[in-house]
Amino acid sequence: MSDPRPETELHLAAPDDTARLGRWLAACLRPGDTVLLQGPIGSGKSHLARSVIQSRLGRPEEVPSPTFTLVQTYGEGADEIWHADLYRLTHPDEVIELGLDDAFGRAICLIEWPERLGRAAPASALRLSFSQDGEGRRVVLTGSADWAGRLSRIGGFAHA
């Protein structure tokens, strides 16, 4: 029996490739989607989130890393995006204090350091795992069965 969780692996040779992946991902996202961005400091998580946010907003909005604010929100209604950096959280219950539990399911949520979510991580989330790959980055995209159709179109990114 095959694994129902689709997985795609990409090599991102340069920061421009990370930004391009962010633009591709922005076009695939829908309200209620959560993207978990996992990887070491400096691996491209914030860069990708910035590209997703700017692409969804349709303008070059300043998108600082939410390392100290923990959460930044952009847009409203169907265009609402939550960008969270959970590095400084010490307990999964703090997610509730941030309001993320309310945002899951209605807004697009981009979550850095998702391991801090514990069991609060949405089962339907798309996980992007970043790692160093020579001079570039390797990113593995893993999603629930809901992501299978969208991830099958990743070839459009890989060959663009």
Where are these regions (language model features)?
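N-terminal pre-Walker A segment at the start of P-loop NTPase domains
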Residues: 2-22
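Phosphate-binding P-loop
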Residues: 26-32
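Conserved lysine of the Walker
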Residues: 45
